[in-house]
Amino acid sequence: MHETRLLPQPHDLLWGMSTDRLDAAAPTWAAEVLAAGRPVVVRRAPARDGWIAVGVRGHGREQRHAAWMPRAAIRRRVQPEQLTGGGEREGVCAPLRALALLQPQLDALCRQRGLAWGVTGGAGYQLATGVTVLGEHSDLDLLLRVPRPLERRQALALLERLEQLPCRVDLQLETPAGAVALRDWASPAARVLLKAGSGARLVGDPWREVAA
């Protein structure tokens, strides 16, 4: 395994951050989340030696706080790929029903092409912690790790499948250079938005661009 894959990656959930690592301006709810033993999520930002860029998640989209976690403090790490079996077809919210419906197709795609996929966002957080953060109208956030180029016609075919699910699905293609939305790559746009540790920029080929 390449050394960089041993490091925490964007969307990984990490346990072990203490409240004393929060900055003085951190909101009270962020300290309460950490005191309850809940994880932080790795965010996409330039690395600092020995530190991981993370975000503390509270209730709702308005409760997000950026922070830095010492790498040495990590006690547990859960990657999006470890959460793919958490969907249910009956009796749960729309995002988890959508996950159950989509899982066989993504599993087959990954077996065929040697890829990996995972669950991120609120669905990933809920599956990893048991804390209910999803509602019937929540989105389902996913990632697909694609080290080699994915043809745009294949991206469009996958997007068309996502559009048939019972909730909006936001799938990010994780390339060696960063992340691009499947929805963008499936479009006819000449350039798409690539999100990398150094920031976001428009590129023609998100596989050939080298992240700074």
Swiss-Prot record:
Organism from which the protein derives: Azotobacter vinelandii (strain DJ / ATCC BAA-1303)
NCBIfam families the record matches: malonate_mdcG (TIGR03135), PRK01293.1 (NF002332)
Biological role: Transfers 2'-(5-triphosphoribosyl)-3'-dephosphocoenzyme-A to the apo-[acyl-carrier-protein] of the malonate decarboxylase to yield holo-[acyl-carrier-protein].
Catalytic activity, as annotated: apo-[malonate decarboxylase ACP] + 2'-(5''-triphospho-alpha-D-ribosyl)-3'-dephospho-CoA = holo-[malonate decarboxylase ACP] + diphosphate
Enzyme Commission no: 2.7.7.66
Residues annotated as the enzyme's active site: 139, 141
Keywords for this protein: Nucleotidyltransferase, Transferase
Origin: domain of life: Bacteria
Similarity remark: Belongs to the MdcG family.
Name the record gives this protein: Phosphoribosyl-dephospho-CoA transferase
GO molecular function list: nucleotidyltransferase activity
